[in-house]
C-alpha cells in the first residue's frame, strides 16, 4: 500500500511517512 500512496503523491516522500503523509496531504488539499 505504501508504494501506491507514494506513487499517487510523490510529495509524501518529504514527510517520510506514506501513511500519515497521505492523510495530511488529503486534508490540506480538501481542506
Swiss-Prot record:
Covalent link location (Cyclopeptide (Cys-Pro)): 11-18
Keywords of the record: Toxin
InterPro entries: Amanitin/phalloidin
The record's account of how the chain is modified after translation: Processed by the macrocyclase-peptidase enzyme POPB to yield a toxic cyclic octapeptide. POPB first removes 10 residues from the N-terminus. Conformational trapping of the remaining peptide forces the enzyme to release this intermediate rather than proceed to macrocyclization. The enzyme rebinds the remaining peptide in a different conformation and catalyzes macrocyclization of the N-terminal 8 residues.
Presence of the UniProt keyword Acyltransferase in the record: no
Leader sequence segment: none
GO molecular function term, any single one: toxin activity
Proregion residues excised on maturation: 1-10, 19-31
Protein name (Swiss-Prot/TrEMBL): MSDIN-like toxin proprotein 8
Similarity section: Belongs to the MSDIN fungal toxin family.
Amino acid at each position: 500500500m505504501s508504494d501506491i500512496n507514494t506513487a499517487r503523491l510523490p510529495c509524501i516522500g518529504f514527510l517520510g511517512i506514506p501513511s500519515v503523509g497521505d492523510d495530511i496531504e488529503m486534508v490540506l488539499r480538501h481542506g
